[in-house]
Amino acid sequence: MPKSSSSLESLKHQALGPNSEAASEAFEALTAIGTEEVAQFYLGLLETAQRGWRYRAAMGLMHLGDARAVAPLLRAIQLPETRGCNGTLVYVLTQFDCRHLLKELFQMVFQQGYEAQLMAMMAIEDQDFEYSIEDAAYIQQQWAVAQLAPSESLLELGLENIRELVEEL
């Protein structure tokens, strides 16, 4: 039975409220409802500055299997204010079809924090990709730059591991 509009509005209000336990329960209920209105609500929250809302919305979209989340997730991952705290967003992104996102995933490996880098590397290792010669050249050029002054997190991931992924292109 579909929820009434007033019930959905009440759950949305609760999801954005100050009580974290009630908010978490509201997000779970909204995800279980899973209507187009819920999906639109979640898509809008991917753009918010509020990290907790953004993460819960991303997880909800993942559970709904809504591939419309891919472009907003990419934008949210690339925001300077999410650097260092966007591993969950990268994880959710990699649960969708990423076959055309090889260049973007390598950019995450080269430019993001450890958790996001790790999630992106796992996706690169696990998924099959379709990419152009230009994409491969761009990735190789970015890899050359990253090796000049590798970040601590790149060193932790293992330069040899990354090199192997790049050389497979």
Where are the language model's segments positioned?
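Amphipathic alpha-helical scaffolding segments comprising HEAT/armadillo-like alpha-solenoid repeats
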Residues: 1-14, 33-47, 66-79, 98-110, ...
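Generic helix N-cap/helix-start motif at coil->alpha-helix transitions
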Residues: 3-6, 15-25, 48-56, 80-88, ...
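Alpha-helix boundary/capping and short turn/kink residues
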Residues: 20, 32-35, 51, 63-67, ...
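Hydrophobic core positions within HEAT/HEAT-like alpha-solenoid repeats
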Residues: 24-27, 43, 57-58, 74, ...
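N-terminal interaction modules that seed assembly of large macromolecular complexes
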Residues: 24-62
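Amphipathic protein-protein interaction modules
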Residues: 107-117, 121-134
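Terminal, low-structured helical/coil segments at or just beyond the last alpha-helical repeat
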Residues: 145-169
